[in-house]
């Protein structure tokens, strides 16, 4: 399972959705990057594959970072790294 975390401006905690395959996670990651780069205030809607009832919608201009984390059962802490790092493209 892959988790895609979105860091939102002026929000302390990231918003997360899950994908079952690396290809699907990469597709969502690229979608978010394109939305961030566009600079438009369009709404990005995502559904979670891990929790099928979970849906999110966020204004693309408010997303400040995105990361993909692979979750496996062998890593302590659920596979999530201890922080979130966002790189802004200039």
Curated annotation (Swiss-Prot):
- UniProt xrefs under HAMAP family: UPF0367
Question: What is the protein named?
Answer: UPF0367 protein Npun_R4552
UniProt record similarity statement: Belongs to the UPF0367 family.
Lineage, opening ranks = Bacteria, Bacillati, Cyanobacteriota, Cyanophyceae, Nostocales
> Source organism's superkingdom?
Bacteria
